[in-house]
Structure formats: structure tokens, C-alpha cells
UniProtKB/Swiss-Prot annotation:
Function summary: The heterodimer acts as both an ATP-dependent DNA helicase and an ATP-dependent, dual-direction single-stranded exonuclease. Recognizes the chi site generating a DNA molecule suitable for the initiation of homologous recombination. The AddA nuclease domain is required for chi fragment generation; this subunit has the helicase and 3' -> 5' nuclease activities.
Listed name of the protein: ATP-dependent helicase/nuclease subunit A
Keyword Nucleus: no
EC numbers on record: 3.1.-.-, 5.6.2.4
Gene that encodes it: addA
GO cellular component: cytosol; DNA helicase complex
Assigned keywords, A-Z: ATP-binding, DNA damage, DNA repair, DNA-binding, Exonuclease, Helicase, Hydrolase, Isomerase, Nuclease, Nucleotide-binding
Length: 1337
């Protein structure tokens, strides 16, 4: 589809020769604008009067994105725009696209380091480490730091001061927090050294003159005090004369504290005295002559609230005299200087450990790249002389100048998530008058402050560029092409009342508000109503109805906890959507039923995800969970970790019980059947009665002793009772144990089968002993992979709910164990200890990522949803309270560090805690920053919705009345913007949402007495919405009520209630109990690989080939190797008989390796011999190619030549449509396939194979197959013809399989063979009705 920019977008695409910042609201098409600007720069040049020869190439433009996926998306979009270009310059860009710098900031820095490492004397042979490995190394660095300080008599006393103040346990976390913040600064050491500045005061000067007061305290307190003063003045305007006089007195006092601009007045001590609420008279007493005593009483209450707020300001910030502020500030400053010295030493140790092992973390990439451009020495092991330092700075200046000349424009996406180091780094690539910056972002979507992103950078640039307008400009994109107006109206209504500079760090004005521009077509009013819904589960109403009974009941128990209750409410609404309602298809804009893949559930935290997965499984709602509360709490990880603990030390009761109860211990179905059990009955894991039986039949105190005693007692008893005990199998032993009358009463009481218990015990000890041998002899990663293979657990979890995510988690555990060992750490015990330490710190290694599910409801955090959009969005758990700051220190990168000072010198037996004003001010600043982040998270969540928006929460009856009082505080403001105090009182997203809705005309009465306290406020954005409260009875009844489908619903979209109907159960039993009627056929040769029968396809009648039918005899089949009966098989003699050498690589091995190279080659990068050789080296080092002689036998030139052919060019032009190594299986009639060999009419042959590759484009498919056959130099054409005939039938089957897989007609599938040795493409069909091979050089 051709992109046509709007008038709003045109300046962002066409403006030249200036730095540009684009503030692009959600859904404004910023990616399309970025791509179009790149295309226009290459088409028209860097200036309006640029000559054709001056136009830049794609690799002259630096494009920095926030994520790897975003970079890939950008590259793909540019490629699609370039393909088909007619201009020679633009056509040339297709080939140059592989050279383009389109990457994340870290990838760009890595390229820079690998190219210019010599500037800073860095070893170029480094390896990047992940978060887990980083944490291990930091543990070592911290221990080394402590050892140094303890060993130094001059420092050990200072270390004790830190431990006295922060505690031994907290000190490490404080230092590591400082280290993390320092990493985001251009000059970490300078930043650390400046932290004590917040506590420095000039001798004899009032604290009001300090940097602390001017930079931190006044910006916080001044505006808030002015807001209080204004509210105070408004009270005096409506009250009686006596009250007005009191207010006048109050205002006279306040006038000495703050001016109209929010600047504080007077000295520190005068402010402390005036702001004390005791300085303001209490509430007026009623008098008989009062005209309106009720009004006076109400006004008195409001004034009392303002008086209390004033008192809070005093008690929070002005509780100390100026003298005490200076005194304790100096003591705290001295302690911070010690702390920063420890932090600096820690960073030095950590850096040395990494350099000794040639390791880099992600922050190193940025710092080393920055050093390359500045010539700074950041290597603690190297000291430069003055001459060396000067030479390094000159070399850095040359690199910087070279890059500035090379990059004609620097484009940065998601600039709001940039930190100060990244900002400085990118500015070094810019030179005024030589190149320009194009920065795109949206401060309203900056949600990564916890990763040291600084959204104020974007705001500063926006203000600066807006004021300039000449050499730079700021542009706004607020037109929304994503969402229906019902969604954007609600978003505007909420944020015009919530977001401003004081609490939100920006103003939500007309430039920031969303303007709906999405075209939903002519059917836009035919879909179900798109009014946003606020769904609240009322947990205060007790459940009164009995649980339903009968086979058709879905919900037979209502969960008591609020999280599960809210999930039932969500499930109920989704169930209704799937059964009854429609949306507009995002692509066709036609009305269609809603499918699970249309729905996304977004949450602030992961804690609700596991509950959703569990409860939705009961509702038969398909779900894909992207992220659980904690990686190590995922069931599959806990099971494997329990097994690792048991392998290390079996005398651990909880891990042992977890293993025994898990699917790791299984009895084969056919064995279980011999004990009268069905295939699924009690054969997977030990049941609770079985474990209880083991316990009561043992005298051991520890659980492993219980298990051992039962197993060996049974085994020894039964083995001794049999003469030929060597021939006794475990199954026979189990049968004897099952008949053993010992413990019969207990068996009958517990309902267990001793034979089955014995088999499970035997399986456990067999598995444990095998894995212990592996653990003793092989690396940790081999042990973990052996667990997966020996137990089949990796496959087992794949069949569970959220299977792909669970499998990804297990693969990630393997990878993390690999990283653990690569860091030099060894041993199972140490690995387990490391994991336990991570868990104690509430740290997490991060869950493995999975792709979005197209056929299931996607569940993810708001952070995960950034950059995505969905037709229907549920924002859930909005009543979850904002987190309070409980850290021992408060760090604000631009302000400083706050903590509580502990004085242990004043009294030998007592430690005195002194709260510091700096700590209070930093906590308040941090709180506001956190609230601003929560506000932006709410914005991101709401703007993911295209058509339907649902907001859910949980409230209780008693809490609802209290909450309504809080929400009604919105009426304290007579303007659309809520007061800062009101917004700060909001403890959850739901609080904020309800505060913004309560002043609208359509706010309903939630319950009797629970309603808006005043008349609606005029001037607010008009937005439709619904608020629904439902209790347990209502939700349960709805879930158990069968739903009538809308006329367009398919069977797959039927109500999930049908999933539990009698018919479904009958169908399920029929499937589970199904007996395959042709079991014997599975033991024949009806399973054939395409490669084993391809000879049978040679020189066939083309008509028969098209029909999938062959006329061949038995000898031909035998020659092809597809034997019909076991007695006719003739296997080749093994190498030890024939004497064949296993040193020389076979043609098959080389062919397999060549196919692997074709499969792994990145199609978006330059495909030359260097790239191929580098890939072969990588595959060899990783063990995928395990024989160097095989690697040497790969025809590198033959691989490269393929991509220089016409077919190869088609492939590289459509990399996203290329599919490689595609497996398939299909059933063909044996009678049709092998006519003439006596196959019965009802026999079928399962053909399986792997298609080397195909590319689907322009409604057709090019199917290609690589061949490494030898070609005679004397008769190459004859050989090619013969080989083409030989393989033609094989490609007919491939084409037939592709037709069934893709739906593309056979006549539109072109078949090609590529012979690597001849470097030739032979086209067998174009279309398949033409059977004359066509050759292409």
C-alpha cells in the first residue's frame, strides 16, 4: 500500500538542513514517517537544491532504534520500498541495504569498538555477558572490594561507619545501585564524586542560598505552597464575613512564604516558623448570629484540610533549624564521600575482572564507544603519559571527524528512552553545519526510567528546538491512525485532567491530545458498539447462591482471592465477546466475529499472569502468557531445579517431594495397564496417598531414607525369593510386590497399588543414578540437556497450557547454565547456590521471550506491549497499588543521594537516627517521578487498543464508599486539571481513572449513596464509557449460562461452555480411547523419505508425475532402496567390515553441511565469500559442523554464486518471504504411487521430507533444492540433464506438498535445482506443465 503523508507529517519528511525533534503521539505513524524520510533523503538529497550526484546512500544514514525487532522492522520496510525502484541510484540501494547502520545503540557501539578498538588500547577479542553472568562477576568484585578495605588499617574504620549507618546487608545493594546509576552517566567517577554536593553549605550563609535549596527543595515546595495559597484564597471568596476575615489573616502570613511564581520567600528559619500549622488559628466556633452555620462548618472543614497540608509541608521539610540542617548535612556529606570511594573501588575491581577475562557488559559498549570518540582513558589497569594521552585525544578526534563526515544524517527512534550517556554519545557524532539529527519519540510513552532512561532529555530538546526554529525545530504528530474515536476520546478525557509539568513532567495540551484519523471503512457502524467499559468485581457482596451442579457447569466454585475473582470477571466478558460480538477486521475493514487472537490482556505486573493461565484453562479460553511473576517460580523451572538439588544432595525433603510428584517420574501406559489401571490413571508422578503409604511403612526420619527403605526392602525381598533372580525384570518384580500381602490394611485404606509404587521408585532411582554419573563426569549444560532427553520433560511441557513459553524457559535455563560455566564458574552445587542467592535478592534472570500468538489471547505486561497494538485490549488489575519507596537510600541521578543519618558517636550504647531534609526532598521528587512513570504506563496501555477497550479492577463494598470519597476530591479543582494534592492521593490507576470520570455528566451511581458529590464540570472532553459492578453470584451465573452465538460465528468461536457439554466429553473419551486399526501397517515400510524413493521418479511420464502416480516394478523399487518387506532388505555392510575409512568425509556429510550453511546464511547481509567462511567457522566452533574436514569440503564459491543468479536475487529481494528447511509429511495412495507392485487399494504411504527452501512472492512460489553432486568436466551438460531427470520427481512431490500447505496452485509453483559444483540453476518447470529443463548460469 502506497504511503501518503498527511499535512501534519509532511514537514517531518521533507524539512532539511536543520536538527529536528518529532513528538509523535501513539498511533501517529512515526515508523512510516521515518521510513519515508529515509527514502526521500536518498531520492531528493540532503537539501532542496541537491544535485543527483550528491544524493546519499542508505549506508550514509545512521538509524538507531530502541530494540532489535524495531531495527529489523525498519530495515524490512525500507527494503520493500526500494524493491521495484526504477531510478538507478535507488536500485543500487537494495544491494547497499546490507551495509546500512540500522541497529540498536548497543549494536552500533559494538561495531564502533570492533573497528576502532586501537584508539583506547582495548583487546578486540571480547565476549558480551548477560545479566546473570554480570551478577556473578559483581559478587566477586564486591568481595574483592571488602577484602581490600578490611585489610587496610586506614580504611577499615571508615568501612565500619558505613556498616553502622546502612547495615552490612544493605551496603552491597546501595553500592550496586550507585554503580547502576553511574553506568548511565558520561563520566561515572565525576558523578559519584558530586553526590555529596547536596549536603554542602557555605559557612555563615542561609541554607536558602545552597544548591540543595535552589535545585531541589524550592521547585518541589514552591508550586505546592502556591497551590495551597490559591485554594485558601478561593475559600475566602465564598464564605461569610467572619470566615473571610480569618482567611485574610491566613493569606497575609502565606504571602511572606511564596510569591505568584512559586518562589519561596524569607529565610530558612522564618519559613519553618510561618509554615507551622500552629501558627494558623483553628476552626472558627459557631455563633448564634451566623447566617449559614452549615456553610461555615463545611468551609471550616475545607480550611482545616488546607491547614493540615501546610503542617505536612512543615513536618516533612522544615522540621530542622538552619543550624541543625547544616550540622547534620556536613556529617552526612562526609559519610557519602566514604560511600562513593567504596563504590569507585568496586567499579574498578569489576572492570579489572572483566578485562582479565576479555568480557564486556552492555554498559561497557556505550562507555568504550564514548571513550573512542573522546580519547578518555577508562581502563583502570593502564596509565597514559601526557604525550600518550594527547596522542589518544588526537586519534579520537580523527575518528569523530571521520564519522561526522560519513553520517549525513543521524536518525534516532524512541528518543524519550535515551539516557545521558547515550545522548552525549550521539551528540558527538553530530557537527553543526555538516550533518543533522532527526529524533523521534513521545515523552508520554517514556516508561523505562527504571533502566536509567531520562525523559527530561526529550523535554529539554523539545523546549530548545521550539524556541529556536532556525537551525532546529520541534514538530508534533498527534493525528491517530490506530484507534477508534471512542478510545481516543477516553484517553484525552483522562490525561487532560492528570498530566502536567508538576506531576507528569509535561503538559497534556492540544498538541499532545490524540486526534482520531483512522479510516474504518463503510462498515464502521456495523460492528458491535465500541464504547469503553470499566468492569469492577464487587468483592464486598458475599456469595449467596449455591454452587451449580451437573455436567454442563463450568464454574463450580467461586475463588475467594481478589486476583482470581477479577480473572473470572475478565474471562466472563471475553467469553461473551467470542460468542456474540463482532469487530472490524484490521486489514479488510469488514465486520467479522471476534477471535481469541484479537484480544490482549495487559497488566502492570506479572503476578496475575499465572492466575490467568490457570483459570482460563478451566474456561477453555486459549491463552499465551508472555512473562510470569518470576522466572524461577515458573513450574517447569522449579521442577528442574528441584531435580538438580536432589542430584546434588538427595537429603532435601522439599525438592525430593517435588521431583517425586512431578511428571519426571512416569510409568509406561502399557505397563500400568497390567495392574488394572487406565492409561492416564496415577501413572505420572507419585500421588499423595502413595507418598503417605511410603511414609507409614518406614521408620526413617528423613524422606530420602523413607524412599530408600521401601524400595530396597521390596527389591531385596523379592529378588531373594526367586532362584534365577538375575533374569527378574523390574516389571516382574512389580507384579510380585503388587501381590505381597504385607501392609494390606494400609493399602486398602489408602487405595494404592504397591506394584505401581515399586515401578515409580525403580524409575526414580534409575534416573537419579544415571544423572549423578553425568553430573560427576560432564559439564553442567550436558547434565541439564540429559535431564530433558532422559525424561522427555521438554516435550511434555510443550503440550501444557502456554507450552511454547515453558519450552523457551527450559531452553533459557540451559543457555544460562552455559553462560555460568563460560564465566569460569564450575560445579552443580555452586550453580544451585547462585540461583538461591538470586532468589533471596528477589532478582530474576528474565524470562525467555516468545512470539505473539495469533490464535490465542495474548497476556503480557504493559512494558511488553510497548510498540504493539491489538483490536481489543483489557487493562487489568488497575486497583493494584503503586509501590512505595522502601529502599535504604534514595538516588536521583540529577539531584543526589538521600538517606537517614545514623550517629553512633554521640553515645557509646546508643545509635541515634537523624532524618535528613535532603532525604525527604529526594523521596518526594522520586515519588513524583514514579507517579509520572505510572501515568505514562497508563497512557501506553490505553493507547494499545484499536477498537475496544476494557478496564478491570476489584473493589469491596466497605472500601467503595471510602474510595468514592477519595475520587470526589476531584471536585477540589474548578479547572480540568486536578490539583497536585488530589493526584498524589491516588494510589492506583483505578483511582486516577475514577477521579477523571467522576466529574463527567455520564458518571453513574455505583450504589446507593456511592455517587458523584457535585455537578459535572464543564469543558471536559466528551467521552462515552460504561461502568459495571458485578459480584460473585452474577459472574458465576454468567459463566454457567450457555450463550447463543451470533449468526456469523463459526464452530470454533462457540461459547466455551460447550467445551464441557456431554457431547464434548463423549468426543473426548472417544479420542482418548481411540485404537489405531492399522497398527500392523506402522511396522512396515509405509513410512518413506522422499530421498529414499527419488530414484523411482526418474524418467517417468510427465503426466504421471503431475498426478503423483508412478509406473515402476519391484526391481526399480529395490534399486531405489524402498523395500516393501523386511525379508527383501539388503543393508550395506558397516565400515569396520568393508574397511572404509571414517576419516575421509563422505559426500553425504559435506552435502548436509552445505545445506546447513544455506539454511543459516543471513539474507539481509552481504553474501560474499568472507561472510560464508565466517559462518562456516562459527558453525564449526559451535559443534553444528563437527568435522573440520567436512567444513573444508564445502564449496564456498558455489554457495556465493547461488545468490548471484536470477533466482538468488529474487531470494535476497524478499528475505521475509523465504522459508528454508521446511519439513512436511503427506499420505499418498500406494496404489497410485507405486502402480505395478501389487499394493492394495486401501494402502497408503506416508511420504516425509524436508524442502530446502521456497520463496513466496507475487502470488507464486519459487521452490529450490540444492544439490552437491559431482559434475563431469568432460560432459557437464549430459550430467546436468541426467541429474535433472533424477531429481524431477522429488520436486514434484515437494510442489504437491507446498500446494497443500500454502494453497498456491501447482501451476504457480516454479521448481529449480541448484548444483553447487556447476554453479548452475536448472529450472524444471515454469509452470510444471513444461517439462523441458531450463538452465541459468
Amino acid at each position: 500500500m502506497v504511503f501518503t503523508p498527511s499535512k501534519e507529517q509532511e514537514p517531518a519528511i521533507n524539512d532539511r538542513q536543520k536538527d529536528i525533534l518529532v513528538s509523535a503521539s501513539a498511533g501517529s505513524g512515526k515508523t512510516a514517517v521515518l521510513v519515508e524520510r529515509v527514502i526521500q533523503l536518498m531520492e531528493t538529497g540532503l537539501s532542496k537544491d541537491a544535485k543527483p550526484s550528491e544524493r546519499p546512500n542508505i549506508d550514509d544514514i545512521l538509524m538507531v532504534t530502541f530494540t532489535t525487532d524495531a531495527a529489523k522492522n525498519m530495515r524490512d520496510r525500507i527494503r520493500r520500498r526500494l524493491v521495484g525502484a526504477t531510478d538507478e541510484h535507488m536500485k543500487a540501494q537494495v544491494a547497499r541495504l546490507a551495509l546500512a547502520n540500522i541497529s540498536t545503540i548497543h549494536s552500533f557501539c559494538e561495531q564502533l569498538i570492533k573497528r576502532y578498538y586501537y584508539v583506547i588500547d582495548l583487546d578486540p577479542q571480547f565476549r558480551l555477558i548477560d545479566d546473570a553472568e554480570q551478577q556473578l562477576l559483581k559478587e566477586q568484585a564486591w568481595q574483592a572490594t571488602l577484602d581490600d578495605w578490611v585489610a587496610n588499617p586506614d580504611q577499615v574504620g571508615a568501612l565500619h561507619q558505613l556498616i553502622d549507618n546502612f547495615g552490612a546487608g544493605n551496603l552491597e545493594s546501595v553500592v550496586q545501585a550507585l554503580d547502576t546509576e553511574a553506568d548511565a552517566q558520561p563520566h561515572p567517577s565525576d558523578w559519584l564524586a558530586g553526590l555529596s554536593g547536596l549536603y554542602q553549605f557555605e559557612e555563615g550563609a542561609d541554607p536558602r542560598q545552597s544548591a540543595f535549596f535552589k535545585r531541589l527543595l524550592e521547585p518541589l515546595v514552591g508550586p505546592q505552597l502556591k497551590e495551597l495559597r490559591d485554594q485558601w484564597a478561593a475559600l475566602g471568596e465564598v464564605g461569610p464575613a467572619r470566615f473571610a476575615e480569618q482567611v485574610e489573616e491566613d493569606l497575609a502570613k502565606l504571602a511572606t512564604t511564596v510569591d505568584d511564581q512559586g518562589h519561596l520567600l524569607g529565610s530558612w528559619d522564618s519559613l519553618a516558623q510561618t509554615l507551622n500549622k500552629k501558627n494558623f488559628a483553628p476552626k472558627l466556633r459557631k455563633r448564634k448570629d451566623d447566617d449559614d452555620p452549615e456553610l461555615l462548618d463545611e468551609l471550616g472543614v475545607q480550611r482545616g484540610g488546607l491547614r493540615d497540608q501546610l503542617g505536612d509541608l512543615h513536618d516533612t521539610y522544615f522540621f530542622q533549624s538552619a543550624a541543625d540542617l547544616v550540622k547534620y548535612g556536613q556529617k552526612a556529606g562526609a559519610l557519602i564521600e566514604i560511600l562513593t570511594r567504596v563504590a569507585t573501588d568496586f567499579r574498578c575491581h569489576y572492570q579489572i575482572i572483566k578485562q582479565d577475562r576479555r568480557l564486556l557488559d552492555f554498559s561497557d559498549l556505550e562507555h568504550y564507544a564514548y571513550a573512542i570518540l573522546t580519547g578518555e582513558n577508562i581502563n583502570p589497569k593502564v596509565t597514559w603519559s601526557d604525550e600518550e594521552a594527547r596522542a589518544k585525544r588526537q586519534a579520537a578526534a580523527q575518528v569523530q571527524a571521520e564519522l561526522q563526515r560519513h553520517y549525513k544524517e543521524i536518525m534516532i527512534d524512541e528518543y524519550q528512552d535515551t539516557n545521558r550517556l547515550q545522548d552525549d554519545l550521539l551528540r558527538l557524532l553530530h557537527k553543526s553545519g555538516q550533518n543533522h539529527r532527526f529524533m523521534v519519540g513521545d515523552m508520554k510513552q517514556s516508561i523505562y526510567r527504571f533502566r536509567q532512561a531520562d525523559p527530561t532529555l526529550f523535554k529539554d530538546y523539545y523546549d530548545q528546538f521550539s524556541a529556536d526554529g532556525q537551525s532546529s525545530e520541534a514538530l508534533d504528530l498527534s493525528d491517530n491512525y490506530r484507534s477508534r474515536h471512542e478510545v481516543t476520546d477516553l484517553v484525552n478525557l483522562i490525561f487532560e485532567q492528570l498530566m502536567d509539568q508538576q506531576l507528569g513532567e509535561m503538559v497534556y495540551d492540544d498538541k499532545a491530545s490524540l486526534k482520531p484519523k483512522a479510516d474504518w471503512g463503510a462498515d464502521r457502524d456495523q460492528a458491535s458498539p465500541a464504547t469503553p467499559e470499566l468492569l469492577l468485581f464487587d468483592g464486598g457482596v458475599k456469595k449467596t447462591t449455591a454452587n451449580p451442579t451437573g455436567e454442563d457447569a463450568i464454574v463450580v466454585r467461586q475463588p475467594e482471592d481478589k486476583v482470581a475473582s477479577e480473572v473470572w470477571l475478565i474471562g466472563q466478558r471475553i467469553r461473551e465477546l467470542l460468542a456474540k460480538e463482532t469487530i472490524l477486521d484490521p486489514e479488510t475493514k469488514r465486520v467479522r466475529p471476534i477471535t481469541p487472537g484479537d484480544i490482549a490482556i495487559l497488566s502492570r505486573a506479572k503476578r496475575i499472569h499465572s492466575v490467568i493461565a490457570e483459570q482460563f484453562a478451566k474456561l477453555n479460553l486459549p491463552v499465551m502468557v508472555h512473562g510470569v511473576e518470576n522466572y524461577f517460580k515458573a513450574t517447569e523451572i522449579r521442577v528442574v531445579m528441584s531435580l538438580l538439588k536432589v542430584i546434588d544432595n538427595p537429603y532435601q525433603d522439599v525438592p525430593l517431594a517435588a521431583v517425586l510428584r512431578s511428571p519426571l517420574i512416569q510409568v509406561a501406559p502399557e505397563v500400568a495397564a497390567k495392574f488394572g489401571l487406565s492409561q492416564g490413571e496415577n501413572r505420572i508422578g507419585f500421588t499423595e496417598p502413595e507418598l503417605a503409604y511410603l511414609k507409614v511403612n518406614s521408620t526413617s526420619k528423613d524422606f530420602f531414607g523413607v524412599v530408600q527403605q521401601n524400595y530396597y526392602a521390596w527389591r531385596d525381598q523379592e529378588v531373594e525369593a526367586v532362584e534365577n533372580h538375575d533374569a527378574l525384570t523390574e516389571e516382574e518384580l512389580a507384579e510380585r510386590v503388587a501381590g505381597d500381602p504385607a501392609g494390606l490394611a494400609t493399602k486398602e485404606e489408602l487405595g494404592v497399588n504397591c506394584g505401581l509404587i515399586y515401578l515409580k521408585l525403580a524409575r526414580f532411582f534409575e534416573l537419579r543414578d544415571h544423572l549423578r554419573r553425568v553430573a560427576q563426569r560432564r559439564p553442567l549444560v550436558d547434565l541439564i540437556w540429559t535431564i530433558y532427553q532422559a525424561t522427555g520433560y521438554l516435550d511434555y511441557v510443550g503440550g501444557m497450557s502456554g507450552g511454547p513459553q515453558r519450552q523457551a524457559n527450559l531452553h533459557a535455563l540451559y543457555e544460562r547454565a552455559s553462560g555460568y560455566e563460560e564465566s569460569g564458574f564450575k560445579g552443580l552445587y555452586q550453580f544451585i547456590h547462585f540461583i538461591e542467592q538470586m532468589q533471596k535478592k528477589n532478582d530474576d534472570l528474565g524470562e525467555a521471550t516468545t512470539a505473539l500468538a495469533g490464535d490465542a489471547i495474548n497476556v503480557m505486561t504493559i512494558h511488553k506491549s510497548k510498540g504493539l497494538q491489538f483490536p481489543i485490549v483489557f487493562l487489568v488489575e488497575t486497583t493494584h497499588q503503586f509501590q512505595a519507596d522502601r529502599d535504604p537510600v534514595t538516588i536521583e541521578p540529577q539531584a543526589g543521594l538521600g538517606f537517614t543519618y545514623v550517629d553512633s558517636t554521640a553515645n557509646e550504647t546508643m545509635r541515634v537516627k537523624h532524618p535528613l531534609v535532603q532525604q525527604a526532598a529526594l523521596k518526594e521528587k522520586k515519588k513524583r517521578q514514579d507517579r509520572a512513570e505510572e501515568m505514562r504506563l497508563l497512557y501506553v496501555a490505553l493507547t494499545r487498543a484499536e477498537q475496544r477497550l476494557f478496564i478491570t479492577g476489584y473493589v469491596k463494598d466497605a472500601d467503595l464508599t471510602k474510595k468514592m470519597d477519595k475520587w470526589n476530591r476531584a471536585f477540589d479543582s474548578a479547572s480540568p486539571l486536578l490539583t497536585t494534592t488530589t493526584r498524589l492521593k491516588g494510589q492506583s490507576m483505578l483511582d486516577w481513572i475514577m477521579m477523571t470520570l467522576v466529574r463527567t455528566a455520564n458518571f453513574p451511581t455505583l450504589r446507593e449513596g456511592v455517587e458523584a458529590a457535585a455537578t459535572p464540570l464543564r469543558g471536559l472532553t466528551k467521552a462515552a464509557y460504561q461502568i459495571k459492578l458485578q459480584n460473585a453470584d452474577q459472574v458465576q451465573a454468567a459463566l454457567n449460562t450457555p450463550l447463543d452465538l451470533h449468526p456469523n460465528a463459526t464452530a470454533e468461536q462457540a461459547t466455551p461452555a460447550a467445551a464441557t457439554s456431554r457431547q464434548f466429553k463423549a468426543d473426548l473419551e472417544r479420542v482418548l480411547n481411540f485404537t489405531y486399526p492399522d497398527q500392523v501397517a506402522t511396522q512396515t515400510t509405509a513410512f518413506q523419505a522422499v530421498s529414499t524413493v527419488r530414484e523411482a521418479f526418474a524418467r517417468q511420464d510427465p503426466t504421471n508425475l503431475e498426478m503423483g502416480r508412478l509406473e515402476i516394478d519391484r526391481d526399480q523399487i529395490k534399486e531405489a532402496g524402498a523395500y516393501l518387506a523386511p525379508e527383501e532388505r539388503a543393508f550395506e555392510n558397516p565400515a569396520f567390515i568393508t574397511g572404509a575409512s571414517d576419516q575421509e568425509p563422505t559426500g553425504t556429510a559435506i552435502g548436509t553441511a552445505t545445506h546447513l550453511v544455506f539454511q543459516k546464511l543471513p539474507l539481509t547481509e552481504p553474501l560474499d565469500e568472507g561472510a560464508v567462511r565466517a559462518l562456516i567457522k562459527s558453525l564449526t566452533e559451535s559443534g553444528l559442523i563437527d568435522n573440520p574436514q567436512v567444513a573444508a569440503g564445502i564449496d564456498v564459491a558455489g554457495v556465493v554464486s547461488f545468490y548471484q543468479t536470477g533466482l538468488g536475487q529474487v531470494i535476497t529481494a524478499h528475505p521475509e518471504q523465504v522459508h528454508r528447511e521446511v519439513p512436511f509429511s503427506m499420505l499418498l495412495s500406494a496404489h497410485d504411487l507405486f502402480s505395478g507392485i501389487g499394493a492394495t487399494d486401501d494402502s497408503e504411504v506416508l511420504i516425509h521430507g524436508i524442502i530446502d527452501g521456497y520463496v513466496q512472492h507475487d502470488d507464486q512460489i519459487d521452490l529450490f533444492d540444492y544439490k552437491t553432486d559431482r559434475i563431469s568436466q568432460a560432459h557437464p551438460e549430459e550430467d546436468l540433464q541426467e541429474l535433472a531427470d533424477k531429481y524431477s520427481g522429488q520436486l514434484v512431490l515437494y510442489a504437491d506438498a507446498l500446494t497443500k500447505m500454502t494453497g498456491v496452485p501447482l501451476e504457480k509453483i516454479h521448481r529449480h535445482l541448484y548444483f553447487t559444483r556447476a554453479k548452475r540453476v536448472v529450472t524444471l518447470s515454469a509452470p510444471p506443465s513444461s517439462h523441458e529443463p531450463k538452465e541459468e548460469a
